Amino acid sequence: MAVKASGFIGKSAISVHLDFSSFPVKFSCLKQFSVSSPKPLVVLSVALSSPARTVESPPVGYRKNVGICLVSPCRKIFTASKIHIPDTWQMPQGGADEGEDLRNAAFRELREETGVTSAEFIAEIPNWLTYDFPREVKDKLNRKWRTSYKGQAQKWFLFKFTGKEEEINLLGDGTAKPEFKVWSWMLPEQVIEHAVYFKRPVYEHVIKQFNPYFVDEEKDSMNSSKD
C-alpha cells in the first residue's frame, strides 16, 4: 500500500510518499491545521499495529489510572471528544488516588467527567493494561502534573448506563475542570476507529474482553416478543 500526502509547514510546501506494502499498519485520522496555526500541519499519522501490554501490577514509572467503558442498553459505548483536542475521542478515564479502591475510583471519575451516577457495575479486566505516551504528549503531561511518567497503567471497568440521557452533563459534578466538549454513543468498532493511535491497542483489548457482555437489550426484547 502506498500513501501520498501534501501540505504546508509554516510557509513551506511538503510532499510525502510512503510505501507500506511490505508490512501491516494502521492509520489514524488525518489531522489538518490552518497555515496560520502556530502548530505544524500534521499530514499523516501512522502507527504499527501491536497488542496491548497486560501486567499484574502497575510498572514503575507508569501513572495508576482507571478506565470506564459505559455501555447503553442498545450496545453502544459512551465516548467523548476532548475540549482542547477536538479530533480525539475516548472513553472516560482518570487517575486513582493512593490507597483508593479502584472500582470506587472508576465511579468517581465517571461522575466527575460525565455527571453520570446511574450506572451498574458489570465486570472488570483482572490485569492492568499499559500504554506509553508519545514524546510530545509525555512532555506536556509531565509538565502539567510535575511528574516523569512514561505512560499510564489502567484498570478497566464495565458499567451499564441505567439512567436517562438528560443525566449526562459534561460539566461533571463540579469537583473538577470539564474535560470534554461533546459526547456520543458509538458502536464498539467505532470506538476503536476514533481512538487516538497510542491508545488503540488498549481499546481493542478492552472491547474484546468486554464483548461477551455487550447485549442489545432492546433488540432481544423485540425478538422475545415475537416468539
From Swiss-Prot:
Disruption outcome: No visible phenotype under normal growth conditions.
Entry EC no(s): 3.6.1.-
Location(s) in or outside the cell: Plastid, Chloroplast
Signal peptide: none
Group of enzyme by EC: hydrolase
PANTHER family according to UniProt: NUDIX HYDROLASE 27, CHLOROPLASTIC, UDP/ADP-SUGAR PYROPHOSPHATASE
Listed name of the protein: Nudix hydrolase 27, chloroplastic
Species for this entry: Arabidopsis thaliana
Classification of source organism: Eukaryota, Viridiplantae, Streptophyta, Embryophyta, Tracheophyta
